[in-house]
């Protein structure tokens, strides 16, 4: 993964010369060491979770790779949370798959069933009252998460990342500031998913 991510960053820098690159995924953000001023990682907002938790029990919803990694444990330890805080790492890979397959758009029953199966027992057993959406896919499932767990606060790090971007690049406007979408997978399939979500933008292939 380290080689793939570092090569991709180098490729993007050479091809687009961006002011800033956001690694829009928690798993590589956690697992890959990147020390570049123009690269922003997306990491679990566990300090905020600890701050607002009443029960002292918070969950990190993430991928299996992240759950099993030493890097996530090190990240939790590095944040030096209060002793009253217990952190439960939960494999939400099945929820991520609902988004990657676009099932969250047109298969409500499957989403409801999967959300309950993956999280109900874990949340109940560990008395979770705050959960971080530590896969950037998971915010798309917020309507289902809030429906089944109204007493749990779900934290989406998107606004925090947007604030970091604004702080670094400022509010300057540019003729180049237009959105273009690229994918290294099937552009037609990805574009179809986006269109169902109301995003009418052309998807370009990035080899």
Question: Model-flagged regions — what are they?
Answer:
Residues 1-207:
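Non-catalytic structural scaffold of enzyme domains
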């Amino acid at each position: 993964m380290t080689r793939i991510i570092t090569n991709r960053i180098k490729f993007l820098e050479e091809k687009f010369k961006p002011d800033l690159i956001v690694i829009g995924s928690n798993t590589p953000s956690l697992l890959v060491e990147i020390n570049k001023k123009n690269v922003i990682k997306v990491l679990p907002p566990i300090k905020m979770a600890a701050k607002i938790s009443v029960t002292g029990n918070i969950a990190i919803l993430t991928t299996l790779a992240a759950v099993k990694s030493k890097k996530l444990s090190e990240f939790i330890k590095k944040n030096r949370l209060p002793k009253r805080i217990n952190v439960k790492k939960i494999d939400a890979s099945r929820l991520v798959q609902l988004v990657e397959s676009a099932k969250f758009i047109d298969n409500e029953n499957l989403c409801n069933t999967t959300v309950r199966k993956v999280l109900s027992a874990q949340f109940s057993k560990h008395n979770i009252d705050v959960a971080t959406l530590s896969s950037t896919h998971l915010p798309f499932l917020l309507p289902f998460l809030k429906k089944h767990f109204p007493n749990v606060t779900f934290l989406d790090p998107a606004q925090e990342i947007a604030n970091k971007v604004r702080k670094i690049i400022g509010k300057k406007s540019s003729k180049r500031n237009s959105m273009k979408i690229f994918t290294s997978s099937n552009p037609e399939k990805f574009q179809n998913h986006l269109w169902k979500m109301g995003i009418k933008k052309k998807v370009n292939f990035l080899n």
